Amino acid sequence: MPPTQAESVIKNIIREIGQECAAHGEIVPETLVAFMVKAVVLDPSNGFNTDRTLTKSDVQKLVKLCVNRLLDSKNPSLDTIKMQVYFDMNYTSREEFLEEHHQVIESRLSSVSREITDSRACVREELESLYRKIVSYVLLRSGLGSPTDIKIVREATAALQSVFPQTELGTFLTLSKKDKERQLKELTMIVTGIRLFNRDCGKGGEGIDDLPAILQEAIPATTQHVDSQLEVVQEQAYRYTAILEKVAKNPLMSQELQPYMLREALYNVRQCEIFLQVILSDIITCAQEVEMMIKQLEAQLEQLKLTVKSKTAVPTSQVFPIFIALSNLWTSFQDETVLISILSNLTTHLEPFLGAHDLFFPEKVMQVLLDGVTVKTDVCRIKEHIEDKVNVADFKKLEWLFPETTANFDKLLIQYRGFCAYTFATTDGLLLPGNPSIGILKYKDKYYTFNTRDAAYSFAENPENYIDIIREKAKRNAELIQLLELHQQFESLIQYSQMKEVDKRYIKPITKCETGTQTDTHLLPPTIVRSYEWNEWELRRKAIKLANLRRKVTHSVQTDHSHMRRENCSQVYPSKDVGTQSMREGSSRVPRPQIYIAGLRGGQTKTTYGVKVNLTRAVDET
């Protein structure tokens, strides 16, 4: 049958079963019906063959069996399956919840944000209306008061005008849609920070709840409520375990106690215990986060007071980051408040799935069944065999892990939720907690624990046999698939998204042992690269040299037209001083002027008369 046709047939079967149950006054969710259909088909006692197509009679038989099981209100097994379906549909991890919660807030604000970003206001009335919408958006996004309360609106408007006056709407309208959305978020955080600071100073904070104080009161109350529920469930589990342990030792009691469905009741309380432990773990995480955030909030407010102390004006670069940090912290407080509320509601809604215990096992019946039985807690059972350990030398082909030799011992994903595989397989479905101190068996990359050393040795002799027995028991009791985390063996019963979560939690062990190593002095020959250069400029010089060589022409790359070419060169002698000598001197010159003046020594009383005499020789005489 094609996959699409098979899906159509299954949907029709689920719809028909839902209608049948509704006709009997029982409204059953489709998820529960779908799980029940697959569980009934999987049970070998019902005679369905998953390898062949269902006939009309098979479909009628399947519908009848599913309706009967879904209407059996006195069956703890059905309550367990309902509990599992409810928890899977309503519980999400902390990270997923915060992501989904923020997505819901964004979707609710999308219409208001769209009205603001798509606005084309021009006239004064339209701009005033747009500004009022921005104030409403800030209040809705921050969650600090109702936008219909006049006092809250006035306070938010005053805070917004201090950082975003109405005169800046023109600039805001010119921005792109993404920039508008980003600015709206920033304005919301800044206004939220301002209002929180004013509230701390006693100058405002209308409509702002004291979330830190509320959480400090709600978390202990929720923790106490979950703890009390967990104690009740664990006490019931210990009593059922003690009775079933007594039955395992006395097979004659098995027939007498068959109508009581003790085994199914044990599965029911163990499943509830696991869910309550998950919830309690999340609450503890919330408490740790809130404690840390309260310290951060006090530190941010103190820093802000020191920054704005006795100052008329403070740079926005100093206070805006603190306002934004305050807003983010307050958003985290709001997230924790919603998360605590959801976890508390989950705990409350798990209680109705335990109603069959008071009906089947009133206190008088339990006292009779517990006659001569010692009720032991899980801790007591582990302490009884705390000193027993598996001798690794007895197993040559199997690997055993111990706390002393495994680094992440506490983080290993133990098969069957940590219950003893051997005890569950060899008894009538008795769930006893495994003792990791005895040793964890690693078999085919899976890890198994046991309540005693003898159980560990017996299981190790033939692991496949006991694993098959447990698988067959899970087919007959579908609630065991979720309870013992057998998802990988029954992938058809769970969604792919859940399979990814199973793979995500799978952690491989990190084993530790005493080892020693010794290295030779010179294990390998030295590899000194002589051509290595650390200097950048030397590398550049070599690169230039290679680039020049690339342009050179060598014989290996000659062509028909260039193979006769060669480089031309010329040689000259360097210049030097040269002198010559002859036998005769040759020269030429002109007469030297010889002019004299006579009669310069005259008498004292007579006038002196000088006579100029030119004795220069003629040119031709020389």
UniProtKB/Swiss-Prot annotation:
InterPro entries: FAP206 (IPR021897). It comes from the Eukaryota. GO terms for cellular component: axoneme; ciliary basal body; motile cilium; radial spoke. Pfam families: FAP206. The keyword Protease does not apply. One of its GO terms (biological process) is cilium movement. Keywords: Cell projection, Cilium, Cilium biogenesis/degradation, Cytoplasm, Cytoskeleton. It is found in: Cytoplasm, Cytoskeleton, Cilium axoneme; Cytoplasm, Cytoskeleton, Cilium basal body. The keyword Transmembrane helix does not apply. Essential for sperm motility and is involved in the regulation of the beating frequency of motile cilia on the epithelial cells of the respiratory tract. Required for the establishment of radial spokes in sperm flagella. Belongs to the CFAP206 family. This is Cilia- and flagella-associated protein 206. It comes from Bos taurus. The gene is CFAP206.
